[in-house]
Amino acid sequence: MADSPFPRSSRSGLLRTTLNSSMPPQNLSHSLLILEKSNAEQNELSLMEDTGDDLDRGKSRMDVLFPQFFDVLQAQGNGQEAFEVIQSLTQVCRGVVEQLELEIDHGMGGEQGARQRESMLTWLRQEINTWRLLHALFYDRILLQTDRQADDEMQDGPTLGGSEKEVIQQLYALNATLREYQLVVDWLEACYDRGEQQNPLHAHDRMMAWENTLFQLENLQGAAFGKGHKIVTRLDPDAPVREKRPLHALDEEDNLRLSRAIFELIRAGRVDDGLKLCKHFGQTWRAAILEGWRLHEDPNFEQNVSVLHEKLPIEGNPRRDIWKRCAWMLADSKNYDEYSRATAGVFSGHLGSLKTLLHSNWHDLLWAHLKVQIDIRVESEIRGCCLKNYQPMPDDYWNGRMTMEQIFEELNVAKDASVRDFAQSQLGIIQRHLILDTCGELIQHMVRWVEKDTSQQSPHQLRFMAHIVLFLRQIGRVEQERQAEKIVAAYVEALIARGEPQLIAYYTASLSNPLQVQLYSRFLEQVEQKRPRELAVDAALQAGLDVEQITRVTVQNIRLAHQPLGEFGEPQSGEISAIDQRKISALEWLIHLPEQRGELLWQANAMIRTYLASSKVECMRQTFRMVPADIVQQLVSLYGSVDNIPPREECCLKEYLCYKAYLSGVDSFVEWNRLQQNRPKKPQTSHAASSQDNFTERMASERKEQAHRSEVVRWEHKVKEQAKQTIELLYNVLMFPDKGWLVDPFIAKLPENAVQLSWDHRLLQMEKLRSICIPEIALFLNEVMFKSGDFAGCVRLADEISSENRQLYKVYTKHKLAELLAKIADASLELLNSKLDPWGYPITT
């Protein structure tokens, strides 16, 4: 067979050469030198690749699954079906697997990088297999079973008297449980991986069965095999069992290898390849045995065929029952190797022979159980519907019937620890519940994994579970939505750690509104720079999130967060701490949408109240700068007119203007105080004039004095103008219109959400600030007027404080009122010293 697909041996004739003996002895030392040089070069290359390899050892290659899964789900919005999405996700994972395999082949990262990539590959292959299982099972459950439901109701059951093939075809069409068993078997066979096991088969173009045994029988005196070694005397297939003698040792080894290769092909679902393998190695009787399981059908009995007067070939084995009984006996016998017994056990429903061989792998054991269960159900249906007398099967065969739940219970308590470990692993539990179609229990398991410790779950495990939940939700298999949301929320938290706004927004949008606000605001709290903030808001808008509520909660969380001071404590006066700077910059979140101007004012005012109470004037100024200068015009244009502004926004607007007036007054006072304390210094007088003083020095001194007098005049004018402006601005605070400074205007009713807004707490804060700031402003005003010589103005200040119109005296404590009256009394005393009465009027007799 020149086109044989199997590996060939370099042997000639009938005898196999010794393994690993192709190297001539005379070239051994030379070859060792070459090998040593090659190893040195390879180590050097590996070191270079270690240096150039990415530091995460393939992690970045695998992390592309996050955006790629997102892209696949986004494409779903363009009309892609749910099952097409699963196929696309599987294909994406395959692409990453191919890339990682390529990197391993190229030796990237050396041994350490290869080990880490291998662990990633192990996970990805299992994930791919699970996606394939999910697609196969639910495609049948959702689409095929729904389409066949009407047909099932019309039919009572399989038709009696049909051929074996017809009966089973009808059985598969009607029995969804059996069809699912077969789907799982097909999946297990498609996912079968031999792993590290190697089973080399030596072959050449013309193969003959048991050629070494034949050679020895034809050359009984051959010294190559020794004397007295008893082997079979005949070469028929039953000779070793009948004579109870072995084949030639090399043929025994080849026989075992062939049996193993055949079984592995059957385990992979490649029965036809197993037949070809038997024929290729000259063991046609094995091929005939493997044909015996096929269902019998004679198409010549069909009416539409008999009209053609042409005989068609008969399919299957008409004596299948006899073959099956013999296959059972072979599988149950101890005279054959375990692979031959297991091969017969696959087609005869003999579970014991399969468990003996496949005891160490969860998937292999599941495959063995399901093959047996399918065989029992198929055989039972055939014997119940076909009008034929069949050879009876042993009771052990029929007693092997189990449900899927019983199969998994047995796997959970398997003798082999590796089987038990996989059964209790996340992938094992996920695959088990997908097969059992117990989606509710699966989601409960996932929730327990997530709630136990999210940090122990890798982001890719969370990605995998979240997308399973999203698929189950889409096909209507999620019963408890809150449980499902916990899994998706855990994945969103993993994405928040990565900081990709589009992905975070998209998956957050699949949650309920409270969770959307909670999670996305948590993400926004971590974004500090302006451009990333804009991208985060844009992503939220595209995903359909409630941006107004999210940004409001974000700013509020940052504003109310209690953060300890650094090791240096509060910064110096006039400086802004990093904590305060973070709170102030958070107001940027409320600038993006014009509809949030009212919320911007509300949050800014709340910050200003806190900073004003803490005497952090510089923080107040910085907060004030975050509010657009034309905020009043924006609010009016937003609501159409001043009369349409809602109560909350109306109160916020007045409060904002109150702070604006306060800052203007305080800043003007600070400027006046600076000017007043920086009177131009008089130039230093020269020493007493002497005979040596010349005219030039005297002239220079006079010019300095004249310049000083001019500078003093300008200074006095500046101080006077600044004092006038300061008095006006400070009076603007005391005389603030519409019920006074930091007093809400009249509103017909409180806002609907006054309780959530802590409206009463705000009013208490404003009242407290009035009791702090109004006495302070009055003292500033008195100081400016007193130092400016306006003593009568100081006395008139008492009239404004005591006026019943504004009732400013109510914000004073006894101590503060006494302090103000004492300063006003000083002004009255100055008036008396100026020959005026205590109120500043001329004294009349």
UniProtKB/Swiss-Prot annotation:
Gene Ontology molecular functions: chromatin binding; structural constituent of nuclear pore
Task: Give positions of region: Disordered.
Answer: 1-26, 677-702
Q: Does the keyword Metal-binding apply?
A: no
Q: Which InterPro entries match?
A: Nup84/Nup107
Q: Would you say which domain of life the source belongs to?
A: Eukaryota
Q: A single GO BP annotation from the record? A: post-transcriptional tethering of RNA polymerase II gene DNA at nuclear periphery
Answer yes or no on keyword Acyltransferase. Answer: no
Q: Which UniProt keywords apply?
A: Chromosome, Cytoplasm, Cytoskeleton, DNA damage, DNA repair, Membrane, mRNA transport, Nuclear pore complex, Nucleus, Protein transport, Translocation, Transport
What does a knockout show? Embryonic lethal. RNAi-mediated knockdown in somatic gonadal cells results in female, but not male, infertility associated with extensive disintegration of the egg chambers and cell death in nurse cells. RNAi-mediated knockdown in spermatocytes causes abnormal localization of nuclear type-B lamin Lam, abnormal spindle envelope integrity and overall defective cytokinesis in meiosis.
UniProt similarity note = Belongs to the nucleoporin Nup84/Nup107 family.
Q: How does it assemble?
A: Part of the nuclear pore complex (NPC).
Annotated function: Plays a role in nuclear pore complex (NPC) assembly and maintenance. Required for nuclear import of Mad. Mediates the association between the nuclear pore complex and a subset of active chromatin regions adjacent to lamin-associated domains. Plays a role in double strand break repair by relocalizing the heterochromatic double strand breaks (DSBs) to the nuclear periphery as part of the homologous recombination (HR) repair process. Regulates cytokinesis during spermatocyte meiosis by maintaining type-B lamin Lam localization to the spindle envelope.
Q: Which PANTHER family match?
A: NUCLEAR PORE COMPLEX PROTEIN NUP107, NUP107-RELATED
**Protein name per UniProt:** Nuclear pore complex protein Nup107
Q: Please name the source species.
A: Drosophila melanogaster
